[in-house]
């Protein structure tokens, strides 16, 4: 999944902080622990790293809550299938809700394309449905895997720090 608080394909590009502001606001005002895991692959735009660094760096102003950013990278494999070897998951999961979408997280995907998204909750909004539990399990599996690295393992241009 790609993330940018801007349009990517519109001309001229424009700033679109809807999600960016929401992540910062819930961490700052409600003490929520936000974890973002984005894909890192051959087609990752260099500009994405500065946006993700900005979210991670916001932690220094938080007295409670947090924002943690990780990059998930599927290992290279000697195969020439275009747009493969990437984690294409696009979802958000909370304690009791899952939001699943076909859209990358940038303005154009929500304002100019015909993607689809849906929200899943338990019958009682305080309960976690089995699907939400499963989506949360997939997230935690990937988050804790060897393929998930802190944004700080990469420089501002996306080059690995060694």
Where are these predicted regions, by residue range?
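PLD/PLD-like phosphodiesterase catalytic module centered on the HKD motif
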Residues: 3-162
């Amino acid at each position: 999944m790609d993330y940018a608080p801007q349009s990517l394909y519109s001309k001229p590009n424009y700033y679109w902080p809807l999600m960016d502001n929401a992540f910062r606001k819930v961490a700052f005002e409600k003490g929520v622990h936000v974890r973002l895991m984005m894909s890192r692959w051959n087609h990752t735009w260099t500009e994405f790293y500065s946006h993700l660094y900005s979210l991670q760096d916001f932690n220094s102003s938080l007295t409670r809550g947090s924002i943690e950013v990780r990059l998930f990278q599927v290992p290279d494999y000697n195969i020439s299938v275009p747009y493969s070897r990437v984690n294409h998951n696009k979802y958000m999961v909370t304690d009791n809700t899952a939001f699943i979408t076909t859209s990358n997280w940038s303005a154009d995907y929500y304002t100019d394309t015909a993607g689809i998204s849906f929200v899943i909750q338990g019958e009682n909004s305080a309960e976690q449905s089995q699907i939400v539990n499963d989506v949360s399990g997939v997230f935690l599996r990937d988050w804790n895997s060897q393929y998930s690295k802190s944004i700080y393992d990469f420089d501002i241009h996306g080059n690995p720090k060694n």
